[in-house]
């Protein structure tokens, strides 16, 4: 009989209960026991929801207070020495590794000052994981038994679950060697790590687990030979052990075909494959399945919010049943549902027609179950009919098509994506306008979003204050930020973005073709959640979006103020995109909307315009090849279409987060100045790659995701390291990213120390 399965469910709670609890704990407002109770309540709620929906195979150990990869590092004792010396509790160690910790000594606790581990994008999603850091002194051992405890927790509720673990090869491959052990190959630690996996799996079996889901998402990457060999070695090893639960080897986000040789013949009970992202792999995967293995068909999209087409999905599952038999097929989500909002029923303000196009995590449970029942011959005719009508109505919807937008995209030519002169000719004109010192200082855009800002925005949205009152409040906040920047001596200022709720949502709300949720939160990292806008139809800008605030900010200072925009690729990648139009087309529509805004800012007297692209690397296809090179070409073109309509003397900036970007790809954007998140890299080789980069650059100097405050000496040391490989005359001094999530006191001190460090180097380079 065909079974239904879910690979993971959002951990945040329908009303962001996890965020409120973790931040409450960090701020000392709740105890650790109260935090743990919230976690237990959320897990219970998720398991019961899936059970009541009729899901056969329900995941456990998909919950985390911060990040599932970080949980594994704590479980296996992959904890760098800088954390262990403080004798923190396990949960405080977890949080210190994720976000850093800086606290003064008290009567009961000693002082702590430790930076966070590196945070990296989870494949091509907008989720971030905390990267495991290995050294030659890493000693694997079990710290607790979280997967077992959560399995038993569900068992007490009468719910039999399938525990989820990130696999050993993916865990090692996605990690890195510590800076003191750079010659260490993480995969060389596999033999030491496998016994710990076996120990956890044995404990799970003893607790009553009959099956486990082991995720090896690296199987959709271009794996080197040693990683493919590691897959064979790891799962052959598991197959040689006795009394372990059956293993479902799970992959997602792409095709496994290039790595099928590593998968064939493995002693695993089932293979899960993502047929949403890579339906073309079906025949080769089915041919590679062993005679007794089950195929888990990932057919309900774990990454996007569009309603499933039951007819198409059922056809794919039936094809698998024809090849393998019903007992060897599972209907599943393509990946964990972590990447989707929790429940569409919480959306009360969406247009009814548009709402009918969507399916959030809770609704996706029903989709998995309906498809399973349909292919099993059960009567779901009413559900199939309603689904078919919904799918058809979306294709005909008035919200989808705009002929004028399509015509404008078709008219894009090379001239529209080329600045009037090359950088070496633009630079002297810009220097004449700005007369900036060596080591110019700036920030990336946002300043702290205080409680007062959120309260007033909420009042305005509810209509309890007028537009005039709200504008007056926003202007007062802008003035505070401008005066602060002048006071500490920053060179190129920002207005602080107090009017913006989110860097994509703010613009999306002013662009035709977008839809927005009230409660469609998705975890980005830790307690940082986002509400991705939804691209429903063709995109266009009806009027100026940011000019008013930028003009006001520039009017109250003699220093240059940057106009701040979010780039076309980031607007695309940090939205739920359409699935009926290719992403290049959507990017070009956004580029044209932003081009109009850039030109309006310049016409209004804004001389520095920053178009942020923190998601540029995220959009890259996971595998090398023509798709990847094509992506870089059209992504760079979209940026240039947005920014190339300005005069030579107008300075274009851009910014990238979490990005291992090739300098040549950044060069293709032709921005005058770029800033890159860098504070947690400590990578001299990466700096050296930019030695011959022709334009100006700022490598981020402090981690804005951590409350920790770097000293002036730390800034000096970091800049000194950079200047060994990068020319001083091209270097800008800036933080990693925007300061929206930080408090004012830590912002004030960190930026003051940063400016003091820049002034120190100006003295050093005077002659």
Curated annotation (Swiss-Prot):
Q: Does the keyword Zinc apply?
A: yes
Q: Which InterPro entries match?
A: Cbl-indep_Met_Synth_N, Cobalamin-indep_Met_synthase, Met_Synth_C/arc, UROD/MetE-like_sf
Binding annotation for L-homocysteine: 444-446, 497, 612
The biological process GO terms on file are:
methionine biosynthetic process; methylation
Q: Which Gene3D superfamilies match?
A: 3.20.20.210
Q: Which GO cellular component terms, listed alphabetically, does the Swiss-Prot or TrEMBL entry include?
A: cytoplasm; plasma membrane
* Residues bound to Zn(2+): 655, 657, 677, 737
Under Enzyme Commission nomenclature, its number is 2.1.1.14
Name the cofactor(s) required for activity, per the record: Zn(2+)
Q: Where is 5-methyltetrahydropteroyltri-L-glutamate bound in this sequence?
A: 19, 126, 502, 525, 528-529, 574
Q: Report the active site residues.
A: 705
Keyword Flavoprotein among record annotations? no
Which residues make up the binding site for L-methionine? Answer: 444-446, 497, 612
Q: Which reaction does it catalyse?
A: 5-methyltetrahydropteroyltri-L-glutamate + L-homocysteine = tetrahydropteroyltri-L-glutamate + L-methionine
List the molecular function annotations (GO) for this entry.
5-methyltetrahydropteroyltriglutamate-homocysteine S-methyltransferase activity; zinc ion binding
Pathway, per UniProt?
Amino-acid biosynthesis; L-methionine biosynthesis via de novo pathway; L-methionine from L-homocysteine (MetE route): step 1/1
**Residue numbers of Phosphoserine PTMs:** 89, 242, 629, 706
Mention any additional remark. Present with 264000 molecules/cell in log phase SD medium.
Q: What task does this protein carry out? A: Catalyzes the transfer of a methyl group from 5-methyltetrahydrofolate to homocysteine resulting in methionine formation.
List the protein's name.
Answer: 5-methyltetrahydropteroyltriglutamate--homocysteine methyltransferase
Organism of origin is Saccharomyces cerevisiae (strain ATCC 204508 / S288c)
């Amino acid at each position: 009989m065909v079974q239904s399965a879910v690979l993971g469910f959002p951990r945040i709670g329908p009303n962001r209960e996890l965020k409120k609890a973790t931040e409450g704990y960090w701020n000392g407002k709740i105890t650790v026991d109260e935090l743990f109770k919230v976690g237990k309540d959320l897990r219970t709620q998720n398991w019961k929801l899936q059970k009541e929906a009729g899901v056969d195979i329900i995941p456990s150990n998909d919950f985390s207070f911060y990040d599932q990869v970080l949980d594994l590092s704590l479980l296996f004792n992959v904890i760098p020495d800088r954390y262990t010396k403080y004798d923190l509790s396990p949960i405080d160690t977890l949080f210190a590794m994720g976000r850093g910790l800086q606290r003064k000594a008290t009567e009961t606790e000693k002082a702590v000052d430790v930076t966070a581990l590196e945070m990296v994008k989870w494949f091509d999603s907008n989720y971030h994981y905390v990267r495991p850091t290995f050294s030659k002194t890493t000693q694997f051992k079990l710290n607790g038994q979280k997967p077992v405890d959560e399995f038993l927790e569900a068992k007490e509720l009468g719910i039999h679950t399938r525990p989820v673990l990130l696999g050993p090869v993916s865990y090692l491959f996605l990690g890195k060697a510590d800076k003191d052990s750079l010659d260490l190959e993480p995969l060389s630690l596999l033999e030491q790590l496998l016994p710990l996996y076996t120990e956890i799996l044995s404990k799970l079996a003893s607790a009553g687990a009959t099956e486990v889901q082991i995720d090896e998402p690296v199987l959709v990457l271009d794996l080197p030979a040693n990683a493919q060999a590691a897959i064979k070695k790891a799962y052959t090893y598991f197959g040689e052990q006795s009394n372990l639960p059956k293993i479902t080897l799970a992959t997602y986000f792409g095709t496994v075909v290039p790595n099928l040789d590593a998968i064939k013949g493995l002693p695993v009970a089932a293979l899960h494959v993502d047929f949403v992202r890579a339906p073309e792999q079906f025949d080769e995967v089915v041919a590679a399945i062993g005679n007794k293995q089950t195929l888990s068909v990932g057919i309900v999209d774990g990454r996007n919010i569009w309603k499933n087409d039951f007819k198409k999905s059922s056809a794919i599952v039936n094809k698998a049943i024809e090849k393998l038999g019903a007992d060897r097929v599972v209907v599943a989500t393509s990946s964990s549902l972590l990447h989707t909002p929790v429940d569409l029923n919480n959306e009360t303000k969406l247009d009814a027609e548009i709402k009918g196009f969507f399916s959030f995590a809770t609704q996706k449970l029903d989709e998995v179950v309906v498809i399973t029942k349909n292919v099993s011959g059960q009567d779901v005719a009413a559900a199939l009919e309603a689904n078919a009508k919904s799918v058809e109505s979306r294709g005909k919807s008035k919200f989808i098509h705009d002929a004028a937008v399509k015509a404008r995209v078709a008219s894009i030519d090379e001239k529209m994506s080329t600045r009037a002169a090359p950088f070496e000719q633009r630079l002297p004109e810009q220097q004449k306008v700005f007369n900036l010192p060596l080591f110019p200082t700036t920030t990336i855009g946002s300043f702290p979003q205080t409680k007062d800002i959120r309260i007033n925005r909420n009042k305005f949205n509810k209509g309890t204050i007028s537009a005039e009152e709200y504008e007056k409040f926003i202007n007062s906040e802008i003035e505070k930020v401008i005066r602060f920047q002048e006071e500490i001596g920053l060179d190129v200022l920002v207005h602080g973005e107090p009017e913006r709720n989110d860097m994509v949502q703010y613009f999306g709300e002013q662009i035709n073709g977008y839809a927005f949720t009230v409660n469609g939160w998705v975890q980005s990292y830790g307690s940082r959640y986002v509400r991705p806008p939804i691209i429903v139809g063709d995109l266009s800008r009806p009027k100026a979006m940011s000019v008013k605030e930028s003009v006001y900010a520039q009017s109250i200072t003699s220093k240059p103020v940057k106009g701040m925009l979010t780039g076309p690729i980031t607007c695309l990648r940090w939205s739920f995109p359409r699935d009926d139009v290719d992403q290049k087309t959507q990017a070009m529509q956004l580029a044209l909307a932003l081009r109009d805004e850039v030109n309006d800012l310049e016409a209004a007297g804004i001389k520095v315009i920053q178009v942020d692209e923190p998601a540029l690397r995220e959009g890259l296809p996971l595998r090398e090849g023509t798709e990847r090179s094509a992506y870089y070409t059209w992504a760079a073109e979209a940026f240039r279409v947005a920014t190339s309509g300005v005069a030579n003397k107008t300075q274009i900036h851009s910014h990238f987060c979490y990005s291992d970007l090739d300098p040549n790809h950044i060069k293709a954007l032709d921005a005058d100045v770029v800033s890159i998140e860098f504070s947690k890299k400590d990578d001299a080789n990466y700096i050296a790659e930019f030695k011959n980069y022709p334009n100006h650059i700022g490598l981020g100097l402090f981690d804005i995701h951590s409350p920790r405050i770097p000293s002036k000496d730390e800034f000096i040391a970091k800049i000194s390291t950079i200047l060994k490989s990068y020319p001083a005359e091209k270097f800008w001094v800036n933080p990693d990213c925007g300061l929206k999530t930080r408090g004012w006191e830590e912002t004030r001190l960190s930026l003051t120390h940063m400016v003091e460090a820049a002034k120190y180097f100006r003295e050093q380079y005077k002659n």
